[in-house]
Amino acid sequence: MDYKKVIAERINKIVDMDVEALYKIIEIPPKKDMGDFALPCFQFAKVLRKAPNAIAEEVCKKIDQSGFEKVENLGPYINFFVDKADFAKETIESVLSERDNYGRSKVGEGKKVLIEYSSPNIAKPFHVGHLFGTVLGSSLYKIFSMEGYDCVRINHLGDWGTQFGKLISAYKRWCDEDALYKDPIKELLRIYVKFHKEAEKDPLLEDEGRMYFKRLEDGEKEEVELWTKFKDLSLREFKKVYNQIGVEFDSYTGESFYSDKIDAIEEELNEKGLLTESNGAKVVMLDEYNMPPCIIKKADGASIYATRDLAAAEYRKKTYNFDKSIYVVGLEQSLHFKQFLKTLELAGHEWSKDCIHVGYGLVRFAEGKLSTRNGDVIFLEDLLKESVQKTSEIIEEKNPELDNKEEVSRKVGIGAVIFTYLKNGRERDIIFDWKEMLSFEGETGPYVQYSYARAKSILRKLGEVKGNVSYDKLVSAEEFDLIKQLKGFNGAILNAIDRLEPSVITRYVIEVAKAFNKFYNAYNISNTSDEELKNARLALVEAASIVIKNALSLIGIDVVEEM
């Protein structure tokens, strides 16, 4: 039973407000003596022309209280207390019967959502900054899919632009072919960094780079062959990383795919009277929207990524007819998205409102922001290796007899990195701290994974839940707090969708793990003399393990059975 829905439907019979809006304002009170659910009455004051306190008192007298232990008003709030035995039975039985499907719904059925994420630049390393958008987008895909949306995962590769002209120039001057095939990304990075250092001394190199890119745009054989080589080698390396972190895509269609669709965009904008010439470049003026012009074509005739994004948006609408198109791209690109989406709107595409930029912060180390150009980049592969190695050392110290130490270290080490990215709101910057990240205590990935392993250990030791379960035995504060947390899973998923924020799930699973460990530390289940109570607690442990596993899967983390 969805208690919030029941409350919303009953309030709807008394107050003129639709069920969906009511559902959204129902809260979980901060204190236990305030009930299990609370409805604030402030929003009804204007419509009913009464004080919120008076409304709460009046509604409380009229509402159908069946199925609740009690309903009472406290100031401007109506507090609902559930029947604990019924609540425990309904929640735990739902989890145990639905298992991997617990939390799933059909709210998104019939709706198509595109999610563009990761989108690394070809010939540049996949560094720790790229991982943020990659795991964020992958998690959004899993969360939307869980609720029935038909999702398409797009990796909009950065495989076009003037940087490829620079890279071709650098390749011709300084590339070591043996090094290129041995470690393509590192060699391409080396020559790219060298190009920029040399260009500081010889500005004509920049002109040479632009010339090579123009030749690439014109389809010149040698330049196209080199560009294809860079792309194939880069993609091979990127896929190694994606395999490590369990990330997949339905499409790798990058910027280059839209290069032959640029002229049509220019023509469309011109026909609609939106195109203006400025210093030789073709732009869409956005002064009245307090934005700089959106450049469509540069003075040298080369296209820019805003134009390619316009072409991609139109192509995707025609191809997929999406209901929502999500762009998971760093906050640094916020202005670009405002310009591009405003241009799309001005071109008469009302569906531009369905295109959403989901921004995220920076990843920082002691040295500050990461940058490819200067070469001070931390490779993601190195970060993952170090995390797995450090985790292995911790596990060796804590449990030297553990089987499958290598696999456990890999899952926990990589999981710890992903968890760190998705723990807080996506717009916040991330600062890596190994000690905190790999700790088995506190709000970390290893802590949550250890909670799951602890639950599985109890189940292995005590066996399966037997026959009919006496849920009325689960009356303690620790037991009921855990049951309430388990009940909140679907609400957390819907909240994550509403806010486009996977950290909602991460924070949720932290709270489940905390509630589970509080319960675990309060009671020695194996020594419980009351067999009915022991069986009920065993059912609760199994339900907790299922929910922790399901929640972790939504943020892309694999569980381990032992730690």
Swiss-Prot record:
- Supply the alphabetized keyword list: Aminoacyl-tRNA synthetase, ATP-binding, Cytoplasm, Ligase, Nucleotide-binding, Protein biosynthesis
For this protein, the record's CDD domains field holds: Anticodon_Ia_Arg, ArgRS_core
Instruction: Cite a GO CC annotation.
Output: cytoplasm
Pfam families with a match to the protein in the record:
Arg_tRNA_synt_N, DALR_1, tRNA-synt_1d
GO biological process terms, alphabetically, are: arginyl-tRNA aminoacylation
Q: Where is this motif: 'HIGH' region?
A: 120-130
Say yes or no: keyword Nucleotide-binding present.
yes
Enzymatic class: ligase
GO terms, molecular function: arginine-tRNA ligase activity; ATP binding
Question: What is the reaction catalyzed?
Answer: tRNA(Arg) + L-arginine + ATP = L-arginyl-tRNA(Arg) + AMP + diphosphate
Q: Where in the cell is it found?
A: Cytoplasm
The answer on whether this UniProt entry bears the keyword Metal-binding reads no
- Name the Enzyme Commission number(s) assigned to this protein: 6.1.1.19
- Subunit: Monomer.
Q: Which family does it belong to?
A: Belongs to the class-I aminoacyl-tRNA synthetase family.
Q: Which NCBIfam families does the record match to this protein?
A: argS (TIGR00456)
Protein name from the UniProt record: Arginine--tRNA ligase
The organism named in the record is Clostridium acetobutylicum (strain ATCC 824 / DSM 792 / JCM 1419 / IAM 19013 / LMG 5710 / NBRC 13948 / NRRL B-527 / VKM B-1787 / 2291 / W)
Supply the source organism's classification: Bacteria, Bacillati, Bacillota, Clostridia, Eubacteriales
Its gene name is argS
